[in-house]
C-alpha cells in the first residue's frame, strides 16, 4: 500500500492558514473512500470500479497528490512508466514511432523511458535488466539484429510484460509490425513497371530482420516478373542505416555496371545514394530511378522528391503501446495478438522510366 507521497504543498481556504503536505488519507477523505481503495486505484486500477476510480483520480487532481514511485516499487507494485527500446533513437522512423508511443502512454496517465540499444544485443540485455529493476509496467522492444532469439525464460521469470515493435516473435507474444516483404515488392514492381530490368537493392544493419525481409521482397518481385534474380538484381549490404552507408553503397555500385533502378532499405540510405550518384555526375531520375523506404517527413522535400514505401509508423507505435498497456493490466481476457500492418508506395519525382 502506498502510504507516502512526494511532498506537495496545498493551500487551505484562506491566507495566513497553515500549508500542509497532501497525504493519501487526504485523497481518501476527498473521494469518500478508504485509503486502501486509493492505493488500489494508483497501483492496480483494474481492480477498482470505474466510478470509484474516477472519483479517486478527480480527488488526486484537485489536491495535487503525487504518488511516491519509490514507495510503490518497494511494495512490489509496477510503476506508471513503460520502457521503449529501439535500435537507433535518432532514426526518423523510430522518432515518429516513439512520439506515437508517448501519446498513447500519456492518454493512459503513463510516461515513457526511451532507450537506445545501438543494435547491440549486450546493451539491449543491460537495458532490459535495468527496466525490470525499475519495475516498469512493461517494455516495447525492437530487438537488435544479432539478438533475434530473446531469453524468454528470463523475461517470463520476471513477469515483465513485453510487446515487440516492428518485429514478429512468436504466437506467445504480442507484436505490431509492418509487412516488409510486401513493401519491397511494391517498390521493385514499380521499378520493373517503369522498364528497369537491372535493379539494385541496398540494405543496412547486416542481419537486421527488416532489411532481410525487404531483400526477400525484392527477389520475389524480380522472380515474379520472369527475370533471374542472380542477374537482374544486385544486392549491396552496408553495416549501418544512415546517409554515409548509402554514400558508400553508391560508390560500390559505380565500380561496376550501374543498375538503372535502385531500391534502398530506408530513406536515409537513399539520400546517401543520391549524394554519391550526384558527385559522380549521375542524375536522378534522368539516369537512375531511386526508391526509398519509410517515407519519412522530409522525403517529399528532398532535392528530388523521393518515391518511397510509406510505413504506418504512427499507427505502429500507438497500437503497440495500447497492446502493452492492455497486456500489463492483468486482464484475464487479454489475448496475445500479432498485428501486421500494410505499407503503401508513394510515387514522386525520383523514379522515372528507363531509357
Language model features: what each stretch is:
Residues 30, 35-39, 74-90, 190, ...:
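Short beta-strand segments enriched in small/hydrophobic residues
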Residues 197-199, 229-233, 283-289:
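Short acidic capping loops at alpha-helix termini that bridge into adjacent secondary structure
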Residues 1-19, 77-189, 193:
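Alpha-helical recognition/docking segments in bacterial nutrient-uptake
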Residues 251, 255-355:
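Flexible loop/turn connectors
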Residues 1-79, 354-355:
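N-terminal helix-turn-helix DNA-binding module of bacterial transcription factors
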Residues 34, 137, 196-198, 259-260:
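Short acidic/polar active-site loop segments enriched in Thr and Asp
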